[in-house]
From Swiss-Prot:
Principal subcellular localisation of the protein: nucleus
Gene Ontology terms: cellular component: nucleus
Region: Disordered, residue numbers: 699-776
Protein's name in the database: Pre-rRNA-processing protein RIX1
Amino acid sequence: MATVTVPLSSLAKLIEESEGSQFRSILQTLRSPTYVNQSLLKSDIGVFVAKLLKLLRSSEPYQIWKGCHAVAVLCSNNPVVLCSQANQFLTVLYTRLESFINFYVETSQSAARLTTLKTLTRTVDILMDLIRGKPTLTREALTPKLNAVIPLLMTLCQYEPELCLPILKKLLLQNTTTFKPFANKYRVILNRLITKDFQLYDRTTQRLICDNFAYLHLIKQNAQKLEENQEHHKTLMDENWRSSILSVLYQFKPLILLCGDILDFSVDSEMLNFIDSLPTPKKDTGEIKDELFAPLSVDMNESFSLWEISYRVEVLSQLLISFISLPTSFPLRIPLHGIIDICQALLMLSTNYLPLKRGLRRETELTAVIITVLRSLQYQGIVVLKSISRCYGKDILYYYSSILSSLELFIPIKARGNAIDYEKVESMKEQVFDLLSLINTLAGHLGHKIDELDLFTKLTDITLRLVEEKSNLGKFYTTVNDAKSIKQTTKQKKDYNKMAGAMSDIYSHPKQFVNKTELRWYDEANKFLSLVVQNWKLPSTQQVNIIKYATVMSITLNEQIGNIPESFEELLTTIVLYPGSERLSILPIAVGLLKNMDNKVFDVLCNPRLPFSCLLNPGSSSIRKDIRNALKMPNGDSDETEETIVTGQQDVLDQSDANGIVTANDIERDRDGPENSIEKPLSALTSIVSDESQIFRKRAVEESESEEEETKRQRPDSAEETENNGETVVIPNVPTQVLQTVETTETAQQPDSDSDSEIEIPTINVSDNDDDDDEE
């Protein structure tokens, strides 16, 4: 049956008056592949496109909004419309966008017009993405329009950076040559966003600003005049990019030297030499430091002016991350040595390593601000190292030992002694979890080969402390008790009673004021703890604390969110597989917690299964059967008796093979060596005994009429030697249960048998219990 669809001409009549669910139904109908028909261009498609153009040219924001969505859906699902009408749609869209941007002040005062402006911008972006990559469309529709679209987006970027920066970033990367005439103007806009308004935006927008600034250096600058002895050298494609990275690096050293007025660098001469070796512009080669910021103004009398240092380093770190992490169409030369040196220098700016200047120790406010600023500078070093380790991985293996030793300086330590200051640790919780993320990335390349175990021991204690849900009410109760002990006037008591009544929830519901830990932080903590448990043997106390944390939090989160996060499942699995020095396993607890998780590791541990190749390999049994044919009775009377003995012996030993019991013949084979085994011919496989209950049943020995034919069963000593056809077989001490076969001849009257004797092959266990049975 042919597919029946609504004609586009009918949709054209409805779309102008449609609202709400009716408009959504029209958009859903436009996704149908039935309309991808070139024969409809002059009929239904032409009518519907004319209606869409009318909506886009309307003065009502709602009609423009509907036209934008209809154009985006139709062009995304109909290649015929895209190829035939993209040029016309793009022209109308950027014309309407220009009218909104030119009157942005009036537009921003109306929520409807502001929403329409954002919809127009996104529709232009969608249409450009659909056109890009198609040669004819790009040449005829996109490239001529970019000279008008780029200035509009640059102007709007000053007001709506989070909206325009992603579009401009793609244009810089995909249409670098077309963007070149606007590079200088765009650089001015980005410089203003970086130096003045950077802290006003969220992290995503800050990252977009830095990425656009980095991609701006894809545009080649005018070639500078080179020296005569350098003119014959070919300019590399990343020359402009590399010079920009070095320009950012050069701005770190003056800021680090400025911290020399706060910290006493003179106590460590190696520190001074290390700072002097940081990247610096070389005047001999004509390197010029591109000053992005104005000179920094810091006054010790105004302690909060020190925050300018932290702000400057933060912006430089974000710019550096963009330069080293963004993909380009050509290979890059990244100065890893200089970047890592900068990060290590930032991590060394700590009161754990260097003391404050003497004149600054007396002022409490200034000291507190300095410590906070230094902590922020150290954190920026961690952020840059985190980006490097993710982008370049094992390329920085050479620097791992120095990086790990520098990271230990980030852990706050009390003024006296080497104890960890957990109060400061809890105040910088997010920063510590970023440190754990960096450690997880670094240790993933080295594992147990890392020698800096002190750092991991400290971080284990810190991690277990931070994942605990705590409140800050401990000091509150102390201050309340102190306030009650102070003598107060009647008015003060009334004010205090009013305040205490408003804060009654603190006393009645203290659990409501507990600081929660985010799930992403749990993931980083669990990944770190799994890494530590897997690669090193921890002290028993830490191992027990990790087990307690994993089990308790798994139960708690399962009750709160209805499932156990994947990171906790991995941590529990690691604890079971690597119990450390603990004698007891938490396997039953872990299996009970993860019974609905379909954990394959626990499934194998609880239900072990041997591979089928081990169960269905009959080769070993056939070799043993051939070896038994060579054994003979020590006191055999005739060839017929020997044949009967061998046959009975094979039946018993076949049963022992089925149960995996080691026999004396196996010991004889091992002593003689593999050479003797190979020389003996292989025999056909015999069928396995069907009745397994007969394997270990001792055969009753019938009383013999003649004492000469009766044989005594004796338990051989571990060092006793027995003769077998002139050969001496030494039976050593065997820890396993040995089944020895002693061939005896018994005579009995068998009416249906041709022979008057029957051979009985009793089974003797080499154990004390068997001695008692023999005596009976």
